[in-house]
């Protein structure tokens, strides 16, 4: 702590002379923050550290609101932020797109914080819902529609197209199918799909950066209709990509399909991570540990928790009627991740590329049904066909 002129200690109930100031507050430009001793400073830490968070949040807020378009000038939203790779956000973003009132909306759609109260009610529970025949049919319908919407996005992917344009097409495709785009306002996520380019692991926010030849981009689609969510994603090549990108994308898809091959009643959810890790590591890649697959039906995210790395401690055994996603995120370098200051965009800490594929699955009496399977090309993903 730095020495400063005499002040009164700011710890509640202490009136001693204070000559020490919090060094983090000095760095962040926070006025005050004087303490008489290390003991008083430590005793106030629980509440004092909130000042640091607020100051940091205020510092990264762009002068121009990121949710409004102001000409074509690209604004750096986070001056001083140290990016791990070459990708940069292209701000400001366009406003959050409206959804017609006649389309059924999930409970978080109009919540000021985008909070799903139905999910919060079940937060922390490991109980896995067994879907009724009616529920299963609802999931089949919505997953088929989600697949159609991903097909629209797939046709958009090429050099020069922005992820913002892909998001716009996805939004319109959802509306035309009487679906709500599930990501929109989910805990205030500002767009209708996630687009994750190169070193972005997941939850990338579509913006005005044009895709470039050699990029890889994951488009993650979830749609909501008649009370159910359907979720899937694929990673696409943009133009001609190098052999490293091809090997990463191919291995990631193989990890997903090898895990799916093991889905059947009686299998522990924790086993899927062992299968994925074995194949990824055999090819020299690592597995992201911070994000995982999840149960899905009337709730966007719920039990079970489905980690993609080995020796995990996931709870639960597969039973007929369970519906969940597997969505491995595989990295060229290390598995460690960071998050951009937007609070969403997860990126590799070493700046190397990451790829992902996802399906929503139904456990049947004898195995599983891939609810989001592509109907064309014998179910093969777009990077193959």
From Swiss-Prot:
Binding site for Zn(2+) 2: 22, 25, 48, 52
Cofactor binding comment, as recorded: Binds 2 divalent metal cations per subunit. Has a high-affinity and a low affinity metal-binding site. The true nature of the physiological cofactor is under debate. The enzyme is active with zinc, cobalt, manganese or divalent iron ions. Has high activity with zinc; zinc cofactor is transferred into the active site region by the ZNG1 zinc chaperone.
Major site of localization recorded for this protein: cytoplasm
Top-level class of the enzyme under EC nomenclature: hydrolase
Names of the cofactor(s): Zn(2+); Co(2+); Mn(2+); Fe(2+)
Binding-site residues for Zn(2+) 3, renumbered to this chain: 220, 231, 358
Gene Ontology molecular function terms on file: initiator methionyl aminopeptidase activity; metalloaminopeptidase activity; zinc ion binding
Residues that bind Zn(2+) 4: 231, 294, 327, 358
Zn finger residue spans: C6H2-type: 6-59
Keywords, comma-separated and alphabetical: Aminopeptidase, Cytoplasm, Hydrolase, Metal-binding, Protease, Zinc, Zinc-finger
Alphabetized Gene3D superfamilies for the sequence: Creatinase/methionine aminopeptidase superfamily
Single biological process term from Gene Ontology: proteolysis
Cellular component terms (Gene Ontology): cytosol; cytosolic ribosome
Binding residues annotated for a protein, in chain numbering: 203, 301
InterPro entries linked to this entry: Creatinase/aminopeptidase-like, Pept_M24, Pept_M24_MAP, Pept_M24A_MAP1, Zfn-C6H2
UniProt-listed Enzyme Commission number(s): 3.4.11.18
Reaction equations catalysed: Release of N-terminal amino acids, preferentially methionine, from peptides and arylamides
Subunit structure: Associates with the 60S ribosomal subunit of the 80S translational complex.
The protein's role, per its UniProt record: Cotranslationally removes the N-terminal methionine from nascent proteins. The N-terminal methionine is often cleaved when the second residue in the primary sequence is small and uncharged (Met-Ala-, Cys, Gly, Pro, Ser, Thr, or Val).
Record-stated family: Belongs to the peptidase M24A family. Methionine aminopeptidase type 1 subfamily.
Protein name, per record: Methionine aminopeptidase 1
Organism: Xenopus laevis (African clawed frog)
